[in-house]
């Protein structure tokens, strides 16, 4: 016959196992939803970039967002970001098209994630107007979840291979 103490211990163990499993399932479901929302953020940014819409491209960043190009040129804050995108979209990247593919998403906290994105670009020109070779590289973004639930770019670093 099983003692009362053993029955209570088994009941508590089963309850804790079920509760933690349920909590894990809920957390995994939330992470899946957030991963999908982050991928949507990447897709919306890529779409704005390919339309050469400086305002919408910069609008994917938080107000004090930070950008660093493949050459190390930084832009900080909404006004600088929009000016940067306006300049490249009206000059050497005015005919460029890019493809961005999310490689990985790593949640640092429930509201902060690091995102690695493989990118490819065609149609670029050199600064003196000559056709540039196709390019590819890696973007590393830090994205943050806003109070609205929207994910936005906080830090953007770009490297070319």
What are the roles of these predicted feature ranges?
Residues 9-21:
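Bacterial N-terminal signal peptides
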Residues 32-41, 54-111, 116-118, 133-134:
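A solvent-exposed, acidic/Ser-Thr-rich amphipathic alpha-helical stretch
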Residues 45, 51-53:
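Short helix-adjacent coil turns
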Residues 23-25:
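Boundary at the C-terminal end of the N-terminal hydrophobic targeting segment
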